[in-house]
């Protein structure tokens, strides 16, 4: 059983908290401290952002984080190295990479999948990869027992949902809002209806991200989703608490986890 499946099974009906941070923001040492701190505070799965120069799906908060990481010279290989170091002391917590296809394409799909598996990566989500073009990467990830995680948006068609249901591993990431990450309004009733619809086709856990920023919104979404994915709010805590990032993020993660237990 994969680490992601084990993580969901261990919750015994509870809801997973999946926080997102950008690797290298503000630096590698802090990233590692944040990863361990978030796990200690209740995170069930970690989502690591791979910095990219044109993060079209991200709002301004995560864009700034990517810019800071890139200014530090962070590359995809550095991200894999961070996971490798994390695995020296944590062999249980699942780690998912989230980013754009370009850095993976440059490395080569086979090499990336092999190196990701060796480093201890459990899943990969590329936000700009249409299903029609992801077949090569999907095969390499599957051959190396790394889950290929897909986004589903409010506008995703039924045919595409059916295809995703056949290919997806680990969990499916439902984008609860149209637009970029960090958008403000979240219609929990609409999300609930959409999750119920998706469950007709998808038999792995469905996580919800985009727009979850506090305990109240996490609690509401946790009533219908298997996982709560929080990115912009976590990254904003890092941005606003220079020198005290781990403590600030740890407190927020604990608050969010307590809301969905």
Curated annotation (Swiss-Prot):
EC main group: lyase
One Pfam assignment: Trp_syntA
CDD domains: Tryptophan_synthase_alpha
Pathway: Amino-acid biosynthesis; L-tryptophan biosynthesis; L-tryptophan from chorismate: step 5/5
Cystine pairings recorded for this chain: none
Keywords assigned by UniProt, alphabetized: Amino-acid biosynthesis, Aromatic amino acid biosynthesis, Lyase, Tryptophan biosynthesis
Keyword field contains Amino-acid biosynthesis: yes
Catalytic residues as annotated in Swiss-Prot or TrEMBL: 47, 58
Catalysis performed (reactions): (1S,2R)-1-C-(indol-3-yl)glycerol 3-phosphate + L-serine = D-glyceraldehyde 3-phosphate + L-tryptophan + H2O
Enzyme nomenclature, EC number: 4.2.1.20
Record note on quaternary structure: Tetramer of two alpha and two beta chains.
Family note: Belongs to the TrpA family.
Protein name: Tryptophan synthase alpha chain
Taxonomic lineage of the native organism: Bacteria, Pseudomonadati, Pseudomonadota, Betaproteobacteria, Neisseriales
């Amino acid at each position: 059983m994969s680490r992601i499946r084990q993580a969901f099974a261990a919750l015994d009906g509870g809801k997973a908290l999946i926080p997102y941070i950008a690797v290298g923001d503000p630096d590698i040492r802090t990233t590692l401290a944040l990863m361990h701190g978030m796990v200690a505070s209740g995170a069930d799965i970690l989502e690591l952002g791979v910095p990219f120069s044109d993060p079209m799906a991200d709002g301004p908060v995560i864009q700034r984080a990517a810019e800071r990481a890139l200014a530090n010279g962070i590359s995809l290989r550095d991200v894999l190295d961070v996971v490798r170091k994390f695995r020296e002391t944590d062999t249980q917590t699942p780690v998912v990479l989230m980013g754009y296809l370009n850095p993976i394409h440059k490395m080569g799909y086979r090499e990336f999948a092999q190196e990701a598996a060796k480093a201890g990566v459990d899943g990969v989500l590329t936000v700009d990869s249409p299903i029609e073009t992801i077949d090569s990467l999907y095969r390499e990830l599957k051959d190396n027992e790394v889950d290929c995680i897909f986004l589903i948006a409010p506008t995703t068609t039924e045919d595409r949902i059916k295809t995703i249901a056949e290919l997806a591993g680990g969990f499916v990431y439902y984008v609860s809002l149209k637009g970029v990450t960090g958008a403000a309004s979240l219609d929990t009733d609409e999300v609930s209806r959409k999750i119920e619809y998706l469950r007709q086709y998808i038999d792995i856990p469905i996580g919800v991200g985009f727009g979850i920023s506090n305990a109240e919104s996490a609690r509401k979404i946790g009533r219908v989703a298997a996982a709560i994915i929080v990115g912009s709010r976590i990254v904003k805590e890092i941005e606003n608490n220079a020198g005290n990032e781990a403590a600030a993020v740890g407190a927020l993660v604990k608050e969010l986890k307590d809301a969905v237990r």
